[in-house]
């Protein structure tokens, strides 16, 4: 993607904190706020200079988007014109707690999860158009990172934190832990980290459903592995756990804190965060109840199949692919 918008980091707070739905405070409120003292003043967003200007139009003009990227914004007035007669919202599936067994509950949970994921993907697509950035945080330039930070701060009413992440590109940002986010941004760092994880997961899901070059799809260990990322679809075949683990290992900038190579040539890897790896596997298989106990049992099944084994020097959560990458 392109470089940062000119002067993004030097914009005054009055320009950064624009919320069309936040009304300006009265003189009485300002006086009351001043009486609190500098230590007790709460951070509050400023209203836009032109209240009639929509947030979408503001971002397009501020970030100087390309004309062809902004054509979809013309539909906004039409949508507002129909606000007097809103359509009936879709109803979430009802989970029947009296149903026998857990099959119905799991099915309902999967439906809810699919609906939520769909809405998240739509929101991310909209943000990408507004900010002119890619959906994969690992590909962001330092300027793209600043745009995303500004957007997230506006969306979730967070105090500005752009200066704390200056000069960081997408790969560096994705490699940071939640604690590192908190150190750089004590107020809101955990929220930023959580939403970055959502963006990474969304990019991962979008990538695995898009067509790509053919990679290793064999279900046994009789063939060698190819370099590059695994095509999870494998011509319609369900993804196997060992393929999923390889996907994570091939994206160290996104998942290096969860799973990493100890010796790539020998195929030895370590699961650093078993709970997170299990959670990601549950998302991939659409199984919200997935945990590491279930995942580890699946890994042990590969011992007999000759796909994964324990290395010569056995260590906890350390495994070895029989046929190295």
From Swiss-Prot:
Region span, Disordered: 27-50, 79-100
Function comment: May function as an androgen-independent transactivator of the prostate-specific antigen (PSA) promoter. Binds to 5'-GGAT-3' DNA sequences. May play a role in the regulation of the prostate gland and/or prostate cancer development. Acts as a transcriptional activator for SERPINB5 promoter.
Pfam families per record: Ets (PF00178), SAM_PNT (PF02198)
InterPro entries: Ets_dom, ETS_fam, Pointed_dom, SAM/pointed_sf, WH-like_DNA-bd_sf, WH_DNA-bd_sf
Expression tissues: Expressed in the accessory glands of sex organs including the prostate, seminal vesicle, coagulating gland in males, the oviduct in females, and in intestines. Expression is epithelial-specific.
Official protein name in the record: SAM pointed domain-containing Ets transcription factor
Subunit structure: Interacts with the DNA-binding domain of the androgen receptor. Interacts with NKX3-1.
Ranges annotated as DNA-binding: 239-322
Domain PNT stretches: 119-203
């Amino acid at each position: 993607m392109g470089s940062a918008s000119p002067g993004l980091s030097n914009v005054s707070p009055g320009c950064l904190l624009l919320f069309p739905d936040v009304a300006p405070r009265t003189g009485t409120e300002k006086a009351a706020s001043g009486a609190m003292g500098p230590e007790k003043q709460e951070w509050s967003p400023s209203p836009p200079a032109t209240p009639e200007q929509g947030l979408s139009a503001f971002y397009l003009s501020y970030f100087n988007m390309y004309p062809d990227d902004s054509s979809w914004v013309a539909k906004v007035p039409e949508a507002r014109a129909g606000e007097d007669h809103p359509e009936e919202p879709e109803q979430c599936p009802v989970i029947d707690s009296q149903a026998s067994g857990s099959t119905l509950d799991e099915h309902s949970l999967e439906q809810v999860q699919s609906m939520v994921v769909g809405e998240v993907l739509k929101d991310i697509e909209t943000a990408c158009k507004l900010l002119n950035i890619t959906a994969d945080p690992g590909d962001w330039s330092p300027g793209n990172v600043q745009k995303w930070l500004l957007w997230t701060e506006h969306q979730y009413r967070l105090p500005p934190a752009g200066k704390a992440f200056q000069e960081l590109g997408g790969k560096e940002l994705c490699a940071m832990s939640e604690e590192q986010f908190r150190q750089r941004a004590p107020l809101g760092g955990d929220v930023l980290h959580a939403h970055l994880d959502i963006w990474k997961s969304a990019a991962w899901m979008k990538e695995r459903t898009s067509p790509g070059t053919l990679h290793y799809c064999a279900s046994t260990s009789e063939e060698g592995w190819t370099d590059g990322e695994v095509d999870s679809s494998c011509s319609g075949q369900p993804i196997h756990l060992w393929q999923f683990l390889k996907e994570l290992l091939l994206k160290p900038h996104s998942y290096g804190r969860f799973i990493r190579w100890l010796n790539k040539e020998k195929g030895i890897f370590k699961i650093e965060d078993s709970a997170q790896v299990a959670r990601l596997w549950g998302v991939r298989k659409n199984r919200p109840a997935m945990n590491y106990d279930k995942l580890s049992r699946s890994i042990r099944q590969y011992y007999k199949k000759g796909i994964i084994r324990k290395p010569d020097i056995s260590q906890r959560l350390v495994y070895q692919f029989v046929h190295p990458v």
